[in-house]
């Protein structure tokens, strides 16, 4: 008989499933923990958001915590969770050492969401107009912090097989410290597809993504400057509907009804928006992790045109549900072709269904995750004994971070 667990999830932000792929990912993990009847406490230091989930409705205890404050130490000592899931390495830096010191027997899991060091290194290479290489991450300050965080944790959840391989091949991280858990999605059934709007019932192009996320903002500029004018020239009545949370004035300035380039702002329901579009455009020139917009497109029967980075680790050996190209002219040509060619459009829809059902099949990935958690909790001492580097980094982190944090706390008291 398996022991019931008490999970503490420490979030970077309060989860907003309709605002970002990261928010959806957090909800997928919560769903699996709830299926096990585990008690969940969700803690976060961020300001409340009106768009976050209803914790009370889900039966989850919601706690606001503070950075650099010893009140967290008392909180976790009283809570005594058996498992702590930390959202992203920056939050692990803030709270991981406190968990290790005051709740040493709790299993520490890092949900990386994406490899930040990879995304930022690609972003820097793009801005410097040069190809990305592994040297960029090996010399990155963010990589040193992120890899240290992975070592300090008992297990890091990887959403991308590409990033999982990168950690093992480039950083030589033991596979025992990693676990591949992509998006956990329900399979698309035949009765789902029969309810989708047809080719003729759909209209226009769509792109979607949190505007605070630099790869998304860059892709909108790329569409505006290099891709959309080519599409609009061939399809003068087509529109591009651009959805995203947190649009700033600079985003809204791009709104241009005359050319069909429409900034729509936050989507109340991203799936509904995607369901009524004929094509999803995602010309991402840098980034990492899984692209929520492309997942939403495939789950709603919407073909997509994207880049190599956009489709990275998302389709295995399967053919993409649309087209992949890094050339802006070809990108526009493929978008125009797919918008007009019903046969190719239907083939692309079917390939998207195949990807969702084979790569992101919830039941098998969820079972592997829960089994891995049980295996780690049952053998935690032996598991940690094999991770000497992790214990060494944790030792020095507690020694240094502890006093810096206490200094900040005292300084804050005096202000």
Where are these regions (language model features)?
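N-terminal subdomain of nucleotide-sugar transferases
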Residues: 1-51
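Acceptor-binding helix/loop patch of EC 2.4 sugar-transfer enzymes
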Residues: 16, 105-106, 110-140, 200, ...
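Acidic donor-binding loop of glycosyltransferase active sites
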Residues: 81-82, 275-289, 302
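A short, active-site helix/loop in glycosyltransferases that binds the activated sugar's phosphate group
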Residues: 94-95, 143-176, 251
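Conserved catalytic-core segment of nucleotide-activated headgroup transferases in glycan assembly
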Residues: 169, 173, 178-275
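Short hydrophobic beta-strand element within catalytic cores of glycosyltransferases
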Residues: 293-296, 303-307
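Conserved acidic donor-binding segment of nucleotide-sugar-dependent glycosyltransferases
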Residues: 321-329, 337-342
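C-terminal amphipathic helix plus adjacent low-complexity
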Residues: 351-415
